């Protein structure tokens, strides 16, 4: 049984779950490469407003969608790239755009899969700050292998080794956890850090 905001979501279609307040990004960037930054965001907004292919509904929602897309563009720091095709953005900018599309519908729970995979250290640092800003007031659940990213983003961390949760706590407590140290650093390092020989 999976509960979101007091309602069961298991068995629901992805678009229904999205409209209930959960959105996600993929490990592989999932945007429209031949649309501009603004158009990608507007598509996300229109979809969240229930627009599919009804022309009259599209017209009635266009002003609101344009305004929301503009706000999102500023939030993800791509307002200077408004008319740039997504395919011409840097990889980090494409990931930022995907985050914008992910939150376009106002989701209060955001799932991210390896959000910084493939980024340079400086891009990763900037992206961590961006994620923190745009997910403020939302629940963020991320799967991430870069422990620097995990410790930079998380209030709580679950460490999973071979399918078993070996720790679930604050970053400081997880960092000090002997089982976590052994799993990620090896027992000799964990013993040395604990004062062993």
Language-model features: locations:
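Glycine-rich phosphate-binding loops of nucleotide-dependent enzymes
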Residues: 1-197
């Amino acid at each position: 049984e999976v509960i979101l905001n007091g309602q069961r979501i298991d068995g629901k279609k992805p678009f229904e779950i999205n409209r209930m307040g959960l959105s996600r990004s993929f490990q592989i960037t999932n945007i429209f490469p031949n649309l501009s930054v603004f158009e990608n965001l507007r598509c996300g907004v229109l979809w969240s407003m229930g627009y599919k292919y009804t022309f009259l509904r599209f017209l009635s929602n266009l002003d609101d969608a344009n305004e929301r897309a503009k706000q999102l563009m500023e939030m993800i720091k791509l307002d200077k790239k408004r008319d740039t095709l997504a395919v011409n953005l840097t990889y980090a900018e494409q990931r930022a755009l995907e985050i914008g599309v992910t939150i376009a519908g106002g989701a209060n729970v955001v799932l991210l899969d390896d959000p910084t995979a493939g980024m340079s250290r400086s891009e990763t640092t900037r992206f961590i700050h961006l994620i923190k800003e745009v997910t403020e007031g939302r629940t963020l659940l991320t799967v991430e292998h870069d422990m620097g990213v995990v410790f930079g983003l998380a209030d709580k961390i679950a460490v999973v080794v071979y399918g078993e949760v070996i720790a679930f706590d604050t970053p400081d407590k997880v960092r000090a956890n002997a089982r976590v140290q052994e799993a990620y650093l090896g027992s000799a390092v964990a013993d040395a850090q604990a004062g062993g020989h």
